[in-house]
Amino acid sequence: SKLCPAVTVECGRPGEPHGVEHAREFLESCLHLSEIPSHPPAHSDLDLFHTVATVKIPDYVRFGFGDSSYSGGSLDLCLVDDLDQLNFQEIPAGTSFGEVCSEMVDHFEVWNEMGEDVGDHFFLVEDGQLRTKKRVMPSMLTLDEEVIRQDCFCYLMERLPY
């Protein structure tokens, strides 16, 4: 065959029963297809996104999660404490990721697929809040500070026309 289709199924956090069940149902339905349809799915049946950037928090930025009043001024960036709820949801421009608590922070480090810094394309500081500049879908957004420091904060996806 000239083609070998492959997919990645994102189903939530490891070990969550709903994610495991969702993956199982998807694979079962694929395995029981009598044939691969020759027509594309209906537009209403498919949301197509692609990863456009990796978001990192610079090493010099002291960050935490929750209300800045609890930090005693020790943080540069106070991220919203339930940001992981935005995972795999398309969010509008202007969505706050947290409060900027020092002048050291003007945006996240955001790198596109070519390794170019595109932070100013996706984020801005407005009224003391670090906000999205455009409609995006965060993926793999984590609240684990060790993962954020060792790997990344999240990825950003944008809708592909279909």
Segments from the language model and where they lie:
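Structured catalytic-domain cores with a bias toward divalent-metal coordination
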Residues: 1-162
